[in-house]
Amino acid sequence: SVIIIDDDEDILELLSEYLLLEDFDVVGRGTDGLQAVNLYAKHTPDFVIMDIAMPTYDGIYGLENIRKLNPNATVIILTGNSDKTINQKIIQLNPTRILEKPCPVEKLVSVLKTIKNSTSYPDTMSILS
């Protein structure tokens, strides 16, 4: 199961539809980090796909608080942010994977399938430097 968090409704719709076509069960969608935490607590999904830059409660808030609920939660961060301070904060919170926006939906699905099929989740595989 998957929850998707992004403040862009078009991205939420696109990802939801594509993931459903790929046989992923999208159990929740939200538009900020607070909704991410609430949806995670309610559904305990296999995957959280979350944007970082969102109004009010950003993805860092969401990631920090999901980590408090479950330090081993599988959280995939989507970011278009080039701010090194923010990127360092994200890395410190140890998301399962960080993908740069724009991220082709096929790449995201490939990452989800790789993680789903691995017996032990890899350490954070960051493409940010």
Name each model feature, range by range.
Residues 41-43, 66-72, 93:
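Conserved phosphotransfer cores of two-component systems
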Residues 8, 48, 52-53:
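The short loop immediately C-terminal to the conserved phospho-acceptor aspartate in CheY-like receiver
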Residues 32-35, 58-61:
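Acidic catalytic/metal-coordinating carboxylates
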Residues 61, 82-99, 110:
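Alpha4 helix (beta4-alpha4-beta5 surface) of REC/receiver domains from two-component response regulators
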Residues 12, 29, 55, 83:
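The feature encodes the CheY-like receiver
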Residues 9-28:
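Two-component/phosphorelay signaling modules centered on CheY-like receiver
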Residues 112, 117-129:
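CheY-like receiver
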